[in-house]
């Protein structure tokens, strides 16, 4: 969206992506076959790539819980999870969970073979049944494994990629979006970044940097009421406690709210914030007294703002990367990409 001249605030990282967080990797498995009414996939995020399981400190929040993110009971109790995050469609959660579990057993082979260990992967979803035959159960365990094995630390493809392939945002083509910010706190530079699977909102709500874009572009709307969701993953290399990470996750509501969404009743608006700092062994192998760094909450506001800015921009990036796609249910309509020329002109005037 920055390429269109949209003046987003803040300083992005070199990739303006969640992979600006050092070491974090993202992969996709994108499934498209119009003859089979297939437009779906899997997005994989690996906060700590490698073959040794380590705790990833995290916090979770649901603005509106009409959706699923597995593993969050333990995140809420223990403040961490282990392994990757995957995002897919609503009916693909079970298959992806099976695939991620198999991948973890194989990747962390020594851990699973030599200890009483269990996998509780984080798998989240949004509904792609307008552009994809979701009841055909196209997503299978091997697609999750393929996305995980494709993960890299480079640029992140946006729009109709991975789990975002069949998603609609504010009745424009939506999907995967990402953005990042660099901030300085206490003389240290940190990265805060987001990845979203944007499938939420109705056209009249869409607001971009304060402009009522949805009301100015009402053509080809698809819905009479909101029926989508958004998954937000926020990542940072700042050392944060699990409590602070939950507070960061809550700020995702502000990020999507800037885009116009009130968090509709039928929307699963579910957020996870994680930190790659405080690298260490699994708790059962750690000493009784843990020593971790933790950013003082009195200095955290800049990080909150960076998270809000990253999420706001990620949603717009998902929309701007869209293309026209034929609907499956109901058939015969077209989910339009946003008119980038009109969007560019709007901000040139403003």
Give the ranges of each region predicted by the language model.
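Alpha/propeptide regions of enzymes that mature by internal proteolysis
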Residues: 1-350
């Amino acid at each position: 969206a920055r390429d269109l001249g949209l003046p987003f605030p803040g300083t992005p990282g070199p990739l303006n992506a969640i992979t600006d967080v050092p070491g974090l990797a993202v992969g996709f498995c994108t499934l498209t076959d119009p003859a089979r009414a297939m437009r779906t996939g899997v997005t994989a995020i690996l906060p700590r790539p490698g073959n040794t399981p380590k705790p990833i400190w995290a916090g979770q929040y649901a603005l509106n819980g009409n959706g699923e993110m597995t593993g969050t009971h333990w995140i809420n109790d223990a403040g961490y999870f282990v392994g990757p995050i995957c995002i897919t469609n609503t009916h693909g959660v079970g298959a992806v969970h099976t695939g991620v579990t198999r991948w973890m057993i194989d990747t962390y082979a020594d851990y699973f073979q030599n200890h009483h260990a269990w996998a509780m992967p984080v798998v989240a979803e949004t509904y792609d049944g307008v552009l994809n035959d979701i009841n055909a159960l196209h997503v299978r365990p091997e697609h999750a494994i393929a996305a995980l094995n494709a993960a890299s630390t480079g640029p992140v493809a946006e729009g109709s990629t991975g789990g975002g392939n069949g998603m609609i945002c504010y009745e424009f083509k939506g999907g995967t979006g990402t953005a990042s910010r660099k901030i300085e706190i206490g003389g240290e530079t940190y990265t805060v970044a987001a990845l979203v699977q944007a499938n939420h909102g109705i056209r009249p709500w869409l607001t971009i940097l304060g402009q009522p874009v949805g009301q100015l572009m009402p053509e080809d709307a698809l819905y009479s009421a909101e029926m989508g969701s958004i998954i937000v993953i926020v990542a940072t290399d700042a050392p944060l406690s699990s409590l602070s990470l939950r507070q960061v996750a809550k700020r995702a509501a502000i990020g999507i709210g800037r885009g116009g969404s009130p968090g509709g009743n039928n929307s699963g608006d579910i957020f996870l914030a994680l930190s790659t700092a405080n690298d260490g062994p699994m708790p059962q192998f750690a000493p009784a007294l843990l020593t971790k760094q933790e950013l003082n909450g009195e200095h955290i506001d800049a990080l909150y703002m960076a998270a809000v800015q990253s999420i706001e921009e990620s949603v717009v990036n998902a929309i701007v990367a869209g293309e026209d796609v034929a609907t499956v249910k109901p058939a015969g309509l077209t989910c339009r990409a946003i008119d980038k020329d009109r969007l560019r002109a709007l901000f040139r005037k403003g």
